[in-house]
UniProtKB/Swiss-Prot annotation:
PANTHER family: ADENYLATE CYCLASE-ASSOCIATED CAP C-TERMINAL DOMAIN-CONTAINING PROTEIN, UPF0225 PROTEIN SCO1677. InterPro entries: NTF2-like_dom_sf, UPF0225, YchJ-like_M. This is UPF0225 protein CV_3559. It comes from Chromobacterium violaceum (strain ATCC 12472 / DSM 30191 / JCM 1249 / CCUG 213 / NBRC 12614 / NCIMB 9131 / NCTC 9757 / MK). Pfam families: YchJ_M-like (PF17775). The lineage of its organism: Bacteria, Pseudomonadati, Pseudomonadota, Betaproteobacteria, Neisseriales. It comes from the Bacteria. Belongs to the UPF0225 family.
Length: 135
Protein backbone atom coordinates (compact mmCIF):
# COMPACT_ATOMS: atom_id res chain seq x y z
CA UNK A 1 0.00 0.00 0.00
CA UNK A 2 1.26 3.49 -0.86
CA UNK A 3 1.89 6.07 1.80
CA UNK A 4 -0.03 9.36 1.70
CA UNK A 5 3.17 11.09 0.60
CA UNK A 6 3.61 8.67 -2.33
CA UNK A 7 -0.04 8.98 -3.30
CA UNK A 8 0.30 12.79 -3.41
CA UNK A 9 3.62 12.84 -5.27
CA UNK A 10 3.68 15.18 -8.25
CA UNK A 11 3.56 13.53 -11.65
CA UNK A 12 6.81 14.10 -13.58
CA UNK A 13 4.79 15.12 -16.67
CA UNK A 14 3.37 18.11 -14.78
CA UNK A 15 -0.25 16.96 -14.99
CA UNK A 16 -1.03 16.88 -11.25
CA UNK A 17 -0.64 14.10 -8.71
CA UNK A 18 1.12 10.99 -10.00
CA UNK A 19 -1.61 8.59 -8.85
CA UNK A 20 -4.33 10.53 -10.68
CA UNK A 21 -2.20 11.30 -13.73
CA UNK A 22 0.35 8.95 -15.32
CA UNK A 23 0.48 6.60 -12.34
CA UNK A 24 -2.78 4.98 -13.43
CA UNK A 25 -1.03 3.70 -16.60
CA UNK A 26 2.40 2.77 -15.21
CA UNK A 27 1.72 -0.37 -13.16
CA UNK A 28 1.84 -3.90 -14.59
CA UNK A 29 -1.94 -4.33 -14.21
CA UNK A 30 -2.78 -0.72 -15.08
CA UNK A 31 -5.17 0.42 -17.78
CA UNK A 32 -3.61 1.32 -21.12
CA UNK A 33 -3.27 5.02 -21.91
CA UNK A 34 -6.43 6.04 -23.82
CA UNK A 35 -4.79 8.57 -26.18
CA UNK A 36 -1.45 9.13 -27.88
CA UNK A 37 -0.84 12.20 -25.70
CA UNK A 38 -1.59 10.25 -22.52
CA UNK A 39 0.87 7.56 -23.63
CA UNK A 40 3.53 10.15 -24.45
CA UNK A 41 3.09 11.80 -21.04
CA UNK A 42 3.23 8.44 -19.26
CA UNK A 43 6.37 7.50 -21.18
CA UNK A 44 8.01 10.78 -20.14
CA UNK A 45 7.07 9.97 -16.54
CA UNK A 46 8.46 6.44 -16.97
CA UNK A 47 11.78 7.88 -18.16
CA UNK A 48 11.83 10.23 -15.16
CA UNK A 49 11.05 7.34 -12.78
CA UNK A 50 13.38 4.82 -14.46
CA UNK A 51 10.62 2.39 -15.49
CA UNK A 52 12.33 0.61 -18.37
CA UNK A 53 9.82 -2.28 -18.47
CA UNK A 54 6.95 0.15 -19.10
CA UNK A 55 8.86 1.96 -21.82
CA UNK A 56 9.65 -1.27 -23.64
CA UNK A 57 6.08 -2.58 -23.24
CA UNK A 58 4.65 0.59 -24.81
CA UNK A 59 7.16 0.66 -27.68
CA UNK A 60 5.83 -0.80 -30.93
CA UNK A 61 7.40 -4.22 -31.61
CA UNK A 62 8.49 -3.13 -35.11
CA UNK A 63 10.87 -0.49 -33.69
CA UNK A 64 11.43 -1.60 -30.08
CA UNK A 65 15.05 -1.91 -28.93
CA UNK A 66 16.11 -4.91 -26.86
CA UNK A 67 16.93 -2.72 -23.85
CA UNK A 68 17.28 0.93 -22.85
CA UNK A 69 19.84 0.66 -20.02
CA UNK A 70 18.22 3.43 -17.97
CA UNK A 71 20.27 2.31 -14.99
CA UNK A 72 23.32 3.81 -16.73
CA UNK A 73 21.58 7.23 -16.73
CA UNK A 74 20.55 7.06 -13.05
CA UNK A 75 22.08 9.97 -11.17
CA UNK A 76 23.29 11.58 -14.42
CA UNK A 77 20.00 12.53 -16.12
CA UNK A 78 17.26 14.32 -14.20
CA UNK A 79 14.03 15.02 -16.09
CA UNK A 80 12.63 18.38 -14.99
CA UNK A 81 9.77 19.38 -17.29
CA UNK A 82 7.51 18.57 -20.19
CA UNK A 83 5.63 20.85 -22.57
CA UNK A 84 3.26 19.42 -25.18
CA UNK A 85 3.38 21.65 -28.25
CA UNK A 86 0.96 19.93 -30.62
CA UNK A 87 -1.16 16.81 -31.09
CA UNK A 88 -2.54 15.44 -34.34
CA UNK A 89 -5.21 12.75 -34.12
CA UNK A 90 -4.34 10.20 -31.43
CA UNK A 91 -7.79 10.01 -29.83
CA UNK A 92 -9.54 6.87 -28.62
CA UNK A 93 -11.10 6.55 -32.10
CA UNK A 94 -7.90 7.03 -34.12
CA UNK A 95 -5.41 4.43 -35.30
CA UNK A 96 -2.48 6.86 -35.50
CA UNK A 97 -1.35 9.95 -33.68
CA UNK A 98 1.45 12.50 -33.55
CA UNK A 99 2.59 14.40 -30.47
CA UNK A 100 5.17 17.18 -30.57
CA UNK A 101 6.78 18.04 -27.24
CA UNK A 102 9.75 19.62 -25.51
CA UNK A 103 11.27 17.69 -22.62
CA UNK A 104 13.69 19.47 -20.30
CA UNK A 105 16.36 17.69 -18.32
CA UNK A 106 19.68 18.15 -16.61
CA UNK A 107 22.54 15.95 -17.72
CA UNK A 108 25.39 16.01 -15.26
CA UNK A 109 23.96 19.28 -13.90
CA UNK A 110 23.79 20.98 -17.32
CA UNK A 111 20.33 22.04 -18.56
CA UNK A 112 19.25 20.52 -21.88
CA UNK A 113 16.09 20.37 -24.00
CA UNK A 114 14.84 17.67 -26.33
CA UNK A 115 12.30 18.79 -28.95
CA UNK A 116 10.69 15.73 -30.54
CA UNK A 117 7.77 14.90 -32.79
CA UNK A 118 6.68 11.35 -31.93
CA UNK A 119 4.53 8.97 -33.95
CA UNK A 120 2.12 6.54 -32.27
CA UNK A 121 -0.04 3.63 -33.47
CA UNK A 122 -3.06 2.10 -31.77
CA UNK A 123 -3.44 -1.67 -32.14
CA UNK A 124 -5.95 -3.87 -30.33
CA UNK A 125 -7.03 -0.93 -28.17
CA UNK A 126 -3.49 -0.02 -27.04
CA UNK A 127 -1.32 2.90 -28.07
CA UNK A 128 2.35 2.28 -28.90
CA UNK A 129 5.26 4.64 -29.47
CA UNK A 130 6.69 3.97 -32.95
CA UNK A 131 9.33 6.59 -33.67
CA UNK A 132 10.40 10.13 -33.01
CA UNK A 133 12.05 12.92 -34.96
CA UNK A 134 14.26 15.08 -32.77
CA UNK A 135 14.50 18.70 -33.91
Amino acid sequence: MKSKKQARAACPCGGGELAACCGRYLGPDASPAPTAQALMRSRYSAYALGLEDYLLATWHPSTRPEALHLDEDAGVVKWIGLEVKRCEAGSERDAEGVVEFVARCKVGGKAERMHETSRFLREDGRWYYVSGLVA
